[in-house]
């Protein structure tokens, strides 16, 4: 125990001297608004133009000297991308108006409430937009009640307005709908401000802030009932809120005329002082995001009744660069992987060496290779990020491999080993027919190209966020190095490199865990108590609700997903052939199952540790973080000491390259064995048969060419993804991969366990599987099952249809023992 305490103390000391990375908001002067400035104008962005309209001021004398408030009707436009930007008077409102609220939607700027020309509160609303070089004003339905200084925010095309204790929503994309009233706030809030930002459990909420208190209401992906109270330890009365990044809300200025910038983090429910914005307007200013991501603070009030025309532009800038030691470690790692490819190239004398490593690899090396293959960079980044933003309920997926490992060893492994298969899909021809084999192999190769692209693209985003290199450069480097050592070294280089990468992954995760817990208030006890109080350790939720990730949903989904991976994925099945005997392969599967389960425990708790760390240190978070999946790599890059950060990033690269190398070699193996060898070499003469040296050379050459082509296609697709909107594409593509992979798992399951299913029945079952999965994926309806159940429901349909179709089309030889069907 004393030694353990010493380790914690040492880690805490190292952590204490670390220079933490920060993102600062740096301000520069922008063109001033003509005139003396206004308070609470309507402001937003439309088609690249900043539009600012209305507002109020005291043009003659300040209110303390008897001055009268003047409402404005001018509309100004600013092109922030121009070489010499300036505010231009581009139109006027139908009548003077001011002290209302506004928010930007895709169609323009929603302007709501305020004071009318007579100085009376109004419920009028309109849409202000910039079209064809001029302003366009389109009337919107009136609010059900007048609202002076309403709180306005937007999410997509939907605008939200809060006034007093009443809240409304309007979908500006639906011209036929009017304002719809939502649940009332628990209390009336005078001078409220609003913002929309992401919250835990992958939801989006509307926030309405008052003085020391705020309330949040979930509005997406599904609107929920009931407001949640948000405590604000820092006073922000009348401060202008602005949602930034994926999880932060900044508050600018406020009463009594402060120039402070505060920040609220929605996931950890923490608020802190972010910066001081000297010289900026302090109250009633227009604060908005420009098209290029910068922040504009325009006009407002600097003292009671004293307006200012001054405008400022804020730019986020990093204050810390990555240490050269980290770069050196990453470069050495990539160089070592390339050297490994050259080293094992000398051992490849034939196709059997290239694709199966000559069957001479130790079981413990193969086991860690399977672990590294299944534990991709997506897993490395997404599991901690998922737990950080929610809880541990998805842990039920991890029980799947524990349940399936003995099943694979007892029933699946003997088939693959005794048939001495290079490609997993050779079995499908023996069991069903050639068409099933070719279909499965072709589908698998397409899966590998797509998976290569996704697995390359996502870590490239992470590397770009950490060290600032261009995403495209990162994709090219990772793809090139992986193709090099995979092409030269074959599967033996892949497996030994996977072994090295597994060691890096395991040691790296231990280091991360130590630093996260040491950086949490209270250390280990603080980590446990803080996580428990927030429900972050919740695993077992036995609610009978198939629309949510309750335990039985995640467990069933995990079993089906692992069934497909460990029985029909060439990446994994190929490794069963690389040990000297079946006993060694069985050991590798069982050991990998235990290791993977323990690894899940570590990475799910790392997600909790990230949450407790940033709840203790919210000021260390990057407020510009664009997506939740970036939280882990940003911690690695910003909050770990030099050297340690480089080793961990090498672990991220290891996870990426493990999956990529497995994908490339498996795709080459499938194409060479199922297409080239089966369809081309089989028709050759005896002298050029597969036993000849010439035939082996051809297989080896074909495998290397296919490895390069698959890598180039995958890398090219990754470059396409990097230069377009990819979030929805990635989500949809993941579902697509899951549907088709589950179908292949069905084929192998029926082949081994359903002896009377013939080729016609198997095909009919696959059609039923795809029909169910695609229908679930592409349709929306009340009570729709959770995504994790799509594969299970598709497999159920397959297992029902296939036996029926086989019974209707049975031939005399159907159902005979496998060896008699050869």
Task: Please give the residue ranges for each predicted region.
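Bacterial N-terminal signal peptides that target proteins for export
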Residues: 1-8
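Short, intrinsically disordered terminal tails adjacent to the first/last structured region
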Residues: 2, 21, 820-822
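Compositionally biased, low-complexity segments enriched in small residues
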Residues: 2, 14-15, 427
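Intrinsically disordered regions, especially transient/low-confidence alpha-helical propensity segments
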Residues: 5, 17, 24, 84, ...
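Hydrophobic h-region of N-terminal signal peptides that target proteins for export
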Residues: 11-20
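Short, intrinsically disordered, charge-balanced linker/junction segments flanking boundaries
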Residues: 18, 158-162, 208-210, 251-253, ...
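Kelch-like beta-propeller repeat domains
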Residues: 21-322
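Membrane-embedded helix-loop-helix hairpins and adjacent transmembrane boundary segments
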Residues: 317-822
């Amino acid at each position: 125990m004393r030694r353990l305490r010493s380790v914690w103390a040492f880690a805490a000391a190292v952590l204490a001297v670390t220079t933490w990375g920060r993102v600062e908001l740096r301000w520069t002067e922008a063109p001033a608004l003509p005139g003396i400035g206004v308070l609470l104008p309507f402001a937003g962005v439309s088609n690249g133009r900043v539009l600012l309209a209305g507002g109020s001021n005291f043009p003659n004398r300040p209110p303390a000297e008897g001055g009268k408030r003047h409402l404005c009707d001018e509309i100004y436009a600013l092109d922030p991308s121009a070489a010499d930007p300036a505010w231009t008077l581009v139109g006027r409102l139908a009548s003077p108006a001011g002290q209302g609220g506004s928010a930007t939607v895709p169609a323009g700027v929603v302007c709501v409430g305020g004071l009318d020309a007579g100085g009376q509160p109004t419920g009028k609303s309109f849409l202000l937009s910039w079209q064809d070089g001029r302003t366009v004003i389109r009337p919107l339905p009136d609010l059900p009640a007048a609202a002076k200084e309403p709180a306005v925010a937007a999410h997509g095309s939907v605008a939200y307005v809060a006034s007093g204790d009443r809240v409304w929503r309007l979908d500006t994309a639906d011209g036929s709908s009017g304002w719809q009233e939502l649940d009332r706030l628990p209390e009336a809030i005078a001078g409220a401000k609003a913002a929309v930002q992401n919250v835990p459990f992958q939801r989006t909420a509307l926030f309405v802030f008052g003085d020391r208190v705020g309330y949040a209401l979930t509005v997406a992906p599904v609107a929920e009932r009931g407001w949640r109270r948000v405590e604000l330890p820092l006073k922000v009365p009348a401060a202008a809120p602005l949602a930034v990044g994926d999880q932060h809300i900044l508050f600018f200025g406020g009463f009594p005329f402060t120039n402070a910038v505060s920040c609220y983090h929605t996931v950890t429910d923490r608020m802190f002082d972010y910066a001081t914005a000297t010289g900026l307007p302090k109250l009633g200013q227009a604060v908005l995001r420009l098209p290029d991501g910068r922040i504009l603070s325009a006009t407002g009030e600097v003292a009671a009744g004293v307006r200012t025309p001054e405008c400022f532009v804020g730019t986020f800038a990093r204050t810390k660069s990555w240490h050269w030691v980290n770069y050196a470690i990453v470069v050495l790692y990539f160089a070592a992987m390339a050297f490994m490819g050259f080293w094992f190239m000398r051992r490849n004398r034939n196709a059997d060496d290239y694709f199966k490593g000559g069957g001479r690899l130790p079981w413990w090396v193969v086991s860690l290779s399977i672990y590294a293959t299944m534990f991709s960079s997506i897993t490395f980044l997404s599991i901690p990020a998922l737990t950080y933003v929610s809880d541990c309920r998805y842990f039920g997926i991890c029980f799947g491999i524990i349940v399936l490992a003995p099943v694979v060893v007892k029933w699946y492994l003997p088939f693959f080993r005794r048939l001495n298969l290079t490609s997993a899909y050779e079995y499908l021809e023996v069991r069903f027919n050639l068409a099933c084999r070719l279909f499965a192999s072709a589908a698998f190769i397409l899966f590998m190209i797509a998976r290569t692209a996704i697995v390359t693209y996502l870590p490239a985003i992470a590397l770009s966020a950490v060290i600032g290199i261009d995403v495209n450069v990162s994709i090219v480097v990772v793809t090139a190095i992986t193709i090099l050592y995979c092409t030269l070294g074959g599967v033996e280089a892949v497996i030994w490199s996977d072994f090295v990468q597994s060691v890096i992954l395991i040691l790296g995760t231990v280091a991360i865990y130590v630093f996260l817990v040491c950086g949490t208030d209270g250390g280990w006890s603080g980590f446990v108590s803080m996580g428990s109080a927030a429900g972050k350790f919740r695993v077992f939720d036995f609610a009978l609700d198939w629309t949510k990730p309750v335990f039985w949903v995640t467990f069933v989904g995990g079993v089906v997903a692992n069934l497909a991976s460990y029985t029909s994925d060439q990446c994994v099945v190929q490794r069963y052939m690389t040990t000297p005997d079946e006993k060694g392969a069985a050991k590798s599967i069982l050991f990998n199952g235990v290791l993977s389960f323990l690894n899940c425990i570590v990475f799910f708790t790392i997600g909790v540790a990230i949450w407790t760390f940033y709840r203790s240190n919210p000021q260390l978070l990057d407020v510009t973080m664009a997506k939740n999946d970036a939280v882990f790599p940003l911690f690695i890059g910003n909050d770990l000491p030099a050297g340690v950060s480089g080793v961990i990033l090498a672990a991220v690269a290891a996870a990426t390259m493990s999956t990529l190398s497995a994908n490339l070699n498996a795709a080459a193996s499938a194409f060479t064995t199922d297409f080239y060898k089966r369809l081309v070499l089989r028709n050759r003469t005896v002298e050029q048969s597969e036993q000849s040296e010439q035939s082996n050379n051809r297989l080896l050459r074909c495998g290397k060419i296919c490895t390069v082509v698959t890598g180039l296609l995958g890398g090219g697709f990754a470059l396409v993804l990097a230069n377009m909107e990819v979030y929805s594409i990635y989500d949809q593509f993941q579902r697509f991969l899951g549907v088709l992979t589950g179908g292949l798992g069905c084929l192998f399951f029926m082949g081994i366990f359903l002896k009377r299913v013939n080729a016609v029945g198997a095909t009919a079952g696959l059609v039923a599987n795809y029909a169910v999965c695609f229908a679930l994926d592409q349709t929306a309806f009340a009570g729709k099952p959770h995504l994790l159940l799509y594969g299970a429901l598709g497999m159920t349909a397959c297992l029902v249809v296939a036996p029926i179709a086989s019974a209707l089309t049975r031939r005399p030889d159907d159902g005979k023992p496998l060896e008699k069907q050869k």
